[in-house]
C-alpha cells in the first residue's frame, strides 16, 4: 500500500462545496453582513485546527527538546506565522495582523455585527470551548461546524487533523471565494 493519497475521489464533494448556493446568494451588502457574521466562526476554528497541527509537529515549551522532522516543523510554523501575523493592509494601526483579526476588521468596515463572535471569544477564553459553543448567539450551522472540527482535534490523530486542514480547508477554501 502506497503512502500517497489520491484526492480525485474527493472531487464530487469539492464541486458540491464550491458550487454551494450560499456563494451565489451573497449579492447585497446586507447578505454579505449575514454571511460574514456566520463565516467568522469557521475562520476562528481554522486557527484552532492549525494550532493543533503546530502542537503536534512543532511543539513548544520549556525546556525545548529536539523532536520530529525539521521540514515539517518549518512548513507548519510558516503557515502559523502567515495566519497569525500577516502583513497588514496599508493605513492600518498595525504592521502585522492575524487573518482572523483582518476578517473582523473587514466585518467592521461593512457594518457587520461583531458582538456574537467577540462574546464567543471572550466566553471561550474565560469559560472554555464547551461554554462558548453553548452560547445561543452562535449560529447553529457554525456550532455544528466547530463541533466537527474540535472532534477531529480531540481525536488526537495527527493524520486526521492534517487531512482536515489540508483537504477540508487549504485545498477547498480558495475555490469557494472565486
Which residues fall in each region the model found?
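Active-site-proximal alpha-helical scaffolds that flank and shape metal-associated catalytic sites
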Residues: 74, 78-178
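Alpha-helical bundle segments that constitute or directly flank the non-heme di-iron/ferroxidase center
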Residues: 2-18, 27-65, 78-87, 138-145, ...
Amino acid at each position: 500500500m502506497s503512502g500517497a493519497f489520491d484526492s480525485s475521489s474527493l472531487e464530487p464533494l469539492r464541486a458540491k462545496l464550491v458550487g454551494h448556493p450560499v456563494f451565489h446568494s451573497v449579492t447585497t451588502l446586507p447578505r454579505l453582513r449575514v454571511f460574514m457574521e456566520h463565516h467568522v466562526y469557521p475562520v476562528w476554528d481554522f486557527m484552532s485546527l492549525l494550532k493543533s497541527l503546530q502542537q503536534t509537529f512543532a511543539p513548544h515549551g520549556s525546556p525545548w527538546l529536539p523532536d520530529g522532522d525539521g521540514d515539517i516543523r518549518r512548513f507548519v510554523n510558516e503557515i502559523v506565522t502567515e495566519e497569525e501575523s500577516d502583513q497588514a493592509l496599508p493605513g492600518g494601526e498595525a504592521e502585522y495582523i492575524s487573518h482572523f483579526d483582518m476578517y473582523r476588521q473587514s466585518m467592521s468596515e461593512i457594518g457587520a455585527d461583531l458582538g456574537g463572535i467577540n462574546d464567543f471569544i471572550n466566553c471561550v477564553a474565560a469559560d472554555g470551548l464547551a461554554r462558548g459553543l453553548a452560547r445561543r448567539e452562535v449560529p447553529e450551522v457554525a456550532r455544528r461546524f466547530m463541533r466537527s472540527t474540535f472532534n477531529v482535534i480531540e481525536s488526537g490523530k495527527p493524520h486526521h487533523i492534517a487531512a482536515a486542514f489540508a483537504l477540508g480547508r487549504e485545498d477547498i477554501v480558495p475555490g469557494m471565494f472565486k
